[in-house]
Amino acid sequence: MLQRFDLDSQDLLFKAESLIVNSTNRYHVTLQIARRAKQARYEEMENLSEETGIKPVLRAILEMSDELNQPEIIGG
């Protein structure tokens, strides 16, 4: 069953903007987001029982901004 997550659009825009501002190359960040979204989509297709209810692009932006703001997540 799909769960619905309430995402604040302003917060999401702020996180996406912070990714772009903190990068040296906007194009590179855009490609990273697209690759992660594509990977997330394929992972969801493999694990049909674990649907998140959030679009892959939004999920990629949230994950990447968390990694930027909290480097201890990725072991840094």
Curated annotation (Swiss-Prot):
Keywords noted in UniProt: DNA-directed RNA polymerase, Nucleotidyltransferase, Transcription, Transferase
Cross-referenced Pfam families: RNA_pol_Rpb6
A Gene Ontology molecular function term of the record: DNA-directed RNA polymerase activity
Catalysed reaction equations from the record: RNA(n) + a ribonucleoside 5'-triphosphate = RNA(n+1) + diphosphate
Subunit structure, interactors included: In cyanobacteria the RNAP catalytic core is composed of 2 alpha, 1 beta, 1 beta', 1 gamma and 1 omega subunit. When a sigma factor is associated with the core the holoenzyme is formed, which can initiate transcription.
Function: Promotes RNA polymerase assembly. Latches the N- and C-terminal regions of the beta' subunit thereby facilitating its interaction with the beta and alpha subunits.
Protein name, UniProt field: DNA-directed RNA polymerase subunit omega
Organism: Synechococcus elongatus (strain ATCC 33912 / PCC 7942 / FACHB-805)
